């Protein structure tokens, strides 16, 4: 959509003012606050044109104008200036994310918390998708007679464990022997390669030990791999939405909070909102497919191991969002996550 310079400046002034005030913006306000060199009457005529073009709306007669979803889209794509984070905000992010972290899920949880704190919106994050992760080590640790703990560690230092039942005749020495064999044979495999038929075939051929003693351990590994492939969802600041006048109606706020309670919905929302170009993605209002968030904007970014996207972080709030602030915060935090992932890998 092509707009002349005058219309663009007026649209930007209206959106900037509305984001700050949450009140419809009138032509006199624009004429007084912004040095556009235009009369109130001229601005009013331009606002009428912008409304006709679908970029502004008038919530009620005699009110000023507010941006439509299309207006916000044009603002984000063409007019928004990305603010740099100030030193205080940067230090806050660094201090919150520089705590001793030795596991990737812990890092993502920490990042989600700091995003909500910095932006004052609701933050969401999905823990890493681990199909492509490489197995670094396997341990089978005796717990008590008839029980053992299978522990696997990936190349991204993600640790998972599973309590399994084993024959009571199995000794700790046998479990050490099995652990050594598992590491020798499985280290370096990606998790998606470790299916039950591969595991069974590999160990039936490789060992003279009774397969009935090994089978519960292999089953335990497969169960762990299945759970790893069901990523966790982290939410912070869910009730922040109640601080915005757009959500003062109880039913509207309730619908939003109910969606956040559905972890599968949130996971799908984030997973479906990324691309392969490592860009920050912004979905505004009706651009969101989910009915309960059509009055919201969703901003998402992916984080990576090397060139592989393994997870997503996001911010959700009203369409009257401080987009510049959110984008700058998310970009910094996403880069920080990627840096910390490299540290975890180097230390692993």
Swiss-Prot record:
The superkingdom listed in its UniProt entry is Bacteria
InterPro entries noted in UniProt: GAF-like_dom_sf, HrcA, HrcA_C, WH-like_DNA-bd_sf, WH_DNA-bd_sf, WHTH_HrcA_DNA-bd, WHTH_transcript_rep_HrcA_IDD
Q: Which Gene3D superfamilies match?
A: 3.30.450.40, Heat-inducible transcription repressor hrca homolog, domain 3, Winged helix-like DNA-binding domain superfamily/Winged helix DNA-binding domain
List the GO molecular function terms: DNA binding
GO term, biological process aspect, one = negative regulation of DNA-templated transcription
Recite the UniProt keywords alphabetically: Repressor, Stress response, Transcription, Transcription regulation
General function of this protein? Negative regulator of class I heat shock genes (grpE-dnaK-dnaJ and groELS operons). Prevents heat-shock induction of these operons.
Family as reported in the entry's similarity comment: Belongs to the HrcA family.
HAMAP family according to UniProt: HrcA
What is the protein name for this chain? Heat-inducible transcription repressor HrcA
Q: Which organism is it from?
A: Ruminiclostridium cellulolyticum (strain ATCC 35319 / DSM 5812 / JCM 6584 / H10)
């Amino acid at each position: 959509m092509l707009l002349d310079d005058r219309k663009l400046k007026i649209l930007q002034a209206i959106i900037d003012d509305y984001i700050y005030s949450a009140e419809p913006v009138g032509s006199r306000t624009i004429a007084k606050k912004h040095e556009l060199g235009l009369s109130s009457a001229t601005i009013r005529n331009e606002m009428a044109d912008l409304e006709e073009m679908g970029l502004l709306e008038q919530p009620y007669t005699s009110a000023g104008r507010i941006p439509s979803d299309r207006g916000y889209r044009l603002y984000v794509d063409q007019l928004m200036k990305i603010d740099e984070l100030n030193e205080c905000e940067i230090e806050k992010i660094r201090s919150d994310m520089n705590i001793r972290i030795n596991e990737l899920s812990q890092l993502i949880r920490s990042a989600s918390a700091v995003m909500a704190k910095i932006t004052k919106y609701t933050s969401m994050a999905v823990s890493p998708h681990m199909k492509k992760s490489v197995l670094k080590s396997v341990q089978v640790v005796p717990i008590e007679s008839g029980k053992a703990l299978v522990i696997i560690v990936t190349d991204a230092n993600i640790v998972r464990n599973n309590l399994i039942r084993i024959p009571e005749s199995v000794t700790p020495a046998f479990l050490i022997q099995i652990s050594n064999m598992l590491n020798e044979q499985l280290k370096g495999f990606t998790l998606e390669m470790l299916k039950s038929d591969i595991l069974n075939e590999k160990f039936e051929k490789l060992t003279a030990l009774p397969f009935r003693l090994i089978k519960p351990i292999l089953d335990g590994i497969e169960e762990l791999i299945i759970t790893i492939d069901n990523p966790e969802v982290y939410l912070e600041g869910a009730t922040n939405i109640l601080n915005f006048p757009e959500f003062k109606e109880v039913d509207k706020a309730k619908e939003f909070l109910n969606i956040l309670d559905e972890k599968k919905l949130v996971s799908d929302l984030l997973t479906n909102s990324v691309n392969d170009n490592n860009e920050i993605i912004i979905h505004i209002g009706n651009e969101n497919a989910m009915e309960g968030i059509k009055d919201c904007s969703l901003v998402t970014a992916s984080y990576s191991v090397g060139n592989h996207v393994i997870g997503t972080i996001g911010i959700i709030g009203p369409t009257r969002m401080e987009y510049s602030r959110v984008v700058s915060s998310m970009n910094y935090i996403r880069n920080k996550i990627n840096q910390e992932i490299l540290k975890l890998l180097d230390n692993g």
